[in-house]
């Protein structure tokens, strides 16, 4: 089936909005407002804080600008849905196509095919006697591409990563944290994405994807019953 142009439409939308605000500002704002909107609805541990931050960002925008960011989120959601059986790093590709690496201290994210190869070399298998999920750590997650590659490899092995895995991803750059959090959320990957310094062990915030937040939701419901 022919793929649509959702990713290209997203890039065009970012460029259009960037005419008056700059590419880096628009892309960074898109990441933050999207990440906080997801977390405000789906992460009960941090919902109040995320909702407050979302409202602070939205209050500074015109209705037209806010609508543009909502459309960008919709386009990203549609793009990830097309790849739900073949997960890939959409935001990382958008970042590179926008040539933002010069403004992000020269950061480059590992291409999908390399991440998939590395994930296959790790050869993740579900032990027959293991009841809990496979836990995988990614200490420098970037846009989440290695986690997405691992999910892809698990899926090819017939392992349901939505039910049989849990990822702990971390990055020192909050923009990378948002990128990873958004994509892992949209792909239904259970994970906590940590804004922190892997070397010094400092942590500043935790972002639980909707699939990871479900146990906390169930616990809240049980307490309220």
Which positions does each model-derived feature cover?
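Class I S-adenosyl-L-methionine
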Residues: 2-158
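Conserved S-adenosyl-L-methionine
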Residues: 112-212
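SAM/dcSAM-binding transferase cores
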Residues: 205-225
């Amino acid at each position: 089936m022919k793929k649509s142009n959702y990713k290209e439409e997203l890039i065009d939308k970012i460029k259009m909005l960037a005419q008056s605000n700059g590419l880096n500002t628009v892309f960074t704002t898109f990441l933050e407002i999207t990440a906080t909107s997801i977390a405000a609805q789906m992460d009960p541990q941090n919902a109040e804080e995320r909702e407050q931050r979302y409202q602070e960002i939205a209050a500074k925008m015109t209705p037209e600008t806010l609508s543009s960011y909502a459309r960008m989120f919709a386009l990203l959601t549609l793009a990830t849905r097309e790849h739900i059986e073949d997960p890939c790093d959409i935001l990382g590709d958008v970042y590179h196509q926008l040539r933002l690496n010069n403004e992000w201290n020269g950061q480059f994210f590992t291409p999908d095919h390399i991440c998939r190869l590395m994930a296959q070399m790790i050869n993740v298998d579900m032990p027959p006697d293991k009841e809990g999920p496979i836990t995988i750590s990614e200490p420098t997650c970037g846009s989440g591409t290695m986690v997405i590659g691992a999910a892809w490899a698990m899926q090819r092995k017939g392992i349901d990563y939505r039910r049989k895995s849990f990822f702990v991803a971390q990055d020192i750059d909050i923009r990378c944290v948002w990128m990873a959090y958004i994509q892992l959320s949209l792909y239904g990957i259970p994970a906590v994405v940590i804004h922190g310094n892997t070397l010094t062990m400092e942590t500043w915030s935790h972002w639980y994807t909707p699939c990871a937040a479900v146990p906390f939701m169930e616990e809240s419901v049980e307490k309220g019953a």
